[in-house]
Amino acid sequence: MCLLRGIPFVDLAYLRKSDLRDNVITYRRRKTGRPLSVTLTPEAMILVKKYMNRDSSSPYLFPFLESREGTKEAYREYQLALRSFNQQLMLLGELLGLGDKLSSYTARHTWATTAYYCEIHPGIISEAMGHSSITVTETYLKPFRSKKIDEANRQVVDFVRRSAGGLIS
């Protein structure tokens, strides 16, 4: 999910085989209705091919759902798949000794945070994630701003120290 620009589990679960053309997944975000196109990196394509639905009669790209989209059965299957996925992620986090609980949204937040640390503009991050506004994206990034500011301050102080030729210690 992190390799797919932090795609939410709900969008991943409802992806159709027809949404994948060559190395591009095109879909509409279920939450906002915004159309998105994700160009798959070679790493992402390897994972898509590994986990894609092998049932030729299923319209879904991944084997989370069996029932027709829009039915109560499909929604129930989605809820069960999400619960199972999150339980497996929590177990993985415990096995790895992570202090924080992992969830499907961890991948989404990780993508946004990593993009921010790579100094990608929040507007690009917002667009990539299909947010309705940059304000939504900023709520993801707010906890990390002070750390970035501290890092910037350290760089400035180090630069001044080097430029002062040892006058500042």
Where are these regions (language model features)?
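Catalytic-site neighborhood detector that most strongly recognizes the C-terminal catalytic loop/helix
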Residues: 29-33, 68, 129-154
